[in-house]
Amino acid sequence: MDDPFSTLAPRRGTQPLLSNWATIGISELHGGALGWGSWWSNLSRLGSSFGSNLKNLGLKAWNSSTGQALRQHLKDTNLQHKVVEGLSTGIHGAVDIARQEVDRQLAKRLENYEPPRVASTEETVDDVKTVALPSKEDESERVLVTKIREPPPPYDAVFGPAPSAETNKKQKFEETLQNAGLVSSPPAPIAAPAAIAVPAQTTMSHPASSRRRHHWQGTLDSIMGLGLQPIKRRRCF
């Protein structure tokens, strides 16, 4: 929105008092002579140049005679090995200190530990109570006779006497005669007369009364009304 803030300024008639700074507050304002983009580019350029200059100085110092002498002295004194040994010694020392602390805590707990008290045999014997066991009754007295199993009946009493050879021959002879038609077969049993089913008595149901059948009509008449019903009475004056 390019409407300047001068529209909010006090006016003298139609002329605003800030007419000389009418461009204040619009999109054409770029900060005057100060450009933030140039500042950022200058800072980034300065940082990159500073880093490259520092790198070049370090390489020159490392490759110089002083740097070579320093490296040779470090190699002669075996500084790298000493640093590694110092680090390993410090690590082992820290581990030893931790182990000593753990051992100290364990020893302290063992000193404060009290073993459980074991009761002596005499006390245990005194604490034991003698309990009288009930006398064992005779096992024969506890046996309850619930059922007496009788011996099975003999074969002859159930199936009858075993047929002899003569009876078998007689039965076979009678069967052959029956097959030949010489001996009449016994008459078939006469079936008993079947019971005649007597029909049940049916009762005639009378139709419902017209009043009950037309119950809704009676309800309608009571709602609508039938007028006054005349009543004839004889009176003597």
UniProtKB/Swiss-Prot annotation:
It holds the Pfam family MCPVI. Residues 35-56 are annotated as: Involved in endosomal membrane lysis. Residues 51-77, 220-226 are annotated as: Interaction with hexon protein. InterPro entries: McpVI. The record marks 32-33, 226-227 as: Cleavage. Ubiquitinated by Nedd4 following partial capsid disassembly; which might play a role in intracellular virus movement during entry. Residues 227-237 are annotated as: Binds to importin alpha/beta, involved in hexon nuclear import. All late proteins expressed from the major late promoter are produced by alternative splicing and alternative polyadenylation of the same gene giving rise to non-overlapping ORFs. A leader sequence is present in the N-terminus of all these mRNAs and is recognized by the viral shutoff protein to provide expression although conventional translation via ribosome scanning from the cap has been shut off in the host cell. N-terminal amphipathic alpha-helix domain is essential for the membrane lytic activity. HAMAP family: ADV_CAP6. Belongs to the adenoviridae protein VI family. This is Pre-protein VI. It comes from Murine adenovirus A serotype 1 (MAdV-1).
